[in-house]
Amino acid sequence: MIQMQTILDVADNSGAKKLFCIKVLGGSKRKYAGVGDIVVCSVREALPNSKVKKGDVVKAVIVRTAKELGRPDGSYIRFDNNSGVVINNAKEPVGTRIFGPVARELRAKKFMKIISLAPEVL
């Protein structure tokens, strides 16, 4: 469960290390984002000579949340951290690699490029 002012780790090699959530996209009164949702973020920490710089405003898709996520079969899944992948306006990842597992719910939200780059889909 991601809301405004949440700090996110970055799960790709775009060069950003920490993201600060500015807005949850999907309606003016929407408060929370879960796995597969898009948020607008500011880059809080970045590596030098990277594709994104500190202070850039970027869009990111949530790939892991610490809040447990219910599945239709009754099972739950949760991760150790809140992580996102920086995306462009075409909803494709800016980086070329994804680090760590991602949730299966991204497949239903049509983020196939992230699914194919991820080392593990849970």
From Swiss-Prot:
Say yes or no: keyword Zinc-finger present: no
Superkingdom of source: Bacteria
| Keywords annotated in UniProt | Ribonucleoprotein, Ribosomal protein, RNA-binding, rRNA-binding
* Pfam families reported in the protein's UniProt record: Ribosomal_L14
Instruction: Supply the PROSITE patterns for this chain.
Output: RIBOSOMAL_L14 (PS00049)
- Extract the GO molecular function terms from the UniProt entry: large ribosomal subunit rRNA binding; structural constituent of ribosome
Q: Name one GO biological process term.
A: translation
SMART domains, per this entry? Ribosomal_L14 (SM01374)
Query: What biological function has been recorded for the protein in this entry?
Result: Binds to 23S rRNA. Forms part of two intersubunit bridges in the 70S ribosome.
Q: How does it assemble?
A: Part of the 50S ribosomal subunit. Forms a cluster with proteins L3 and L19. In the 70S ribosome, L14 and L19 interact and together make contacts with the 16S rRNA in bridges B5 and B8.
Its protein name is Large ribosomal subunit protein uL14
What species was this sequence derived from?
A: Trichlorobacter lovleyi (strain ATCC BAA-1151 / DSM 17278 / SZ)
> Upper taxonomic classification of the species?
Bacteria, Pseudomonadati, Thermodesulfobacteriota, Desulfuromonadia, Geobacterales
The primary gene name is: rplN
